[in-house]
């Protein structure tokens, strides 16, 4: 395992640094501000800001941002989720300092040049159209809208054409939103690579402390809480698609919940992306009804959900749903044997180890753990906890989460 170091700046910015021998350093800033922190009339703001921060800062034009990173052979990227916005780059470690300066300038000193941001509005509008043309992607948004109905979690990350045009009218809209949500105490600086902790802290103090326009103030955002409806339901949308797209799922546990890891293992057994998962073996291998099928468990800060997604010929949708429910019932009614559990654990251990070879994913996962847990355990520590899970605990969670009355179903037919 690599050494991991932690430090907090006086203004509240958390720093996590993982020292590796790689010549490549991943450096980024994750902010605990995403779609669920928006009001309905400003939906899409977090994602809009993510785009606009590439369009110019006090020290860099839009072209200079890209040229600076690509000129040293690096890569820069960003993404928005329901709860976070992240900006990060990968460069050779000797360019760490200038890369952090660029990222900090983007996050702390954007200019929102109207000419540049208007171009980005067109780009995002096209992104919305593209998303609407992809049922395999759109169904995830519609499912979240369904399962989190009445909550800000139901809103799409991209926003709508109407809200995007509204929030892009004046630079003051995004600047005001950033002043409220891009707080230092909601930021994580993450660094992974062959640079010293002293270098990281010294650079962070210069870029994120002394130069930060966001000072700690008496600001207490309202706590975000979501209570799901006790009654699940089904919904069907008419879409002009060759296949029927199906998604079903229910609410699960939030980040840090004692049963979160049990749900993680249970989902891996059910349909977690391998060809030996129960759903894949049944619907693909045994019956040949789908090309692909998988499930995922998504923990959030105060809630969570899991879902199964598949696409099939319209005449097979009922059989596919029946087979999905059959596998869920099997997990509710029948405990795993010791042999089955050990096989599931061996499989998960290998998956975690292989996944850990992806340094980019490691760095991003480390940042998210730091944001919510204030520490970043490595995969070996996580797996050590998973190994303690019993068949009884798996069955208990299956009965809580997979209960028929709790399962929402969405179809594009």
Language-model region placement:
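Short, solvent-exposed loop/turn segments at the edges of secondary structure
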Residues: 22-24, 82, 184, 241-245, ...
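N- or domain-start disorder-to-order transition segments that initiate the globular core
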Residues: 1-24
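Generic preference for hydrophobic
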Residues: 15-17, 29, 189, 248, ...
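Charge-rich, well-structured scaffold segments of protease-associated domains
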Residues: 8, 65-227, 253-254, 271, ...
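His/Glu-based metal-binding/catalytic segments typifying zinc-dependent metallopeptidases
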Residues: 19-21, 28-30, 216-277
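Short amphipathic
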Residues: 6-8, 233-239, 410-411
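M16/MPP (pitrilysin/insulinase) zinc-metallopeptidase core fold and M16-derived inactive scaffolds
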Residues: 21, 28-90, 156, 273-289
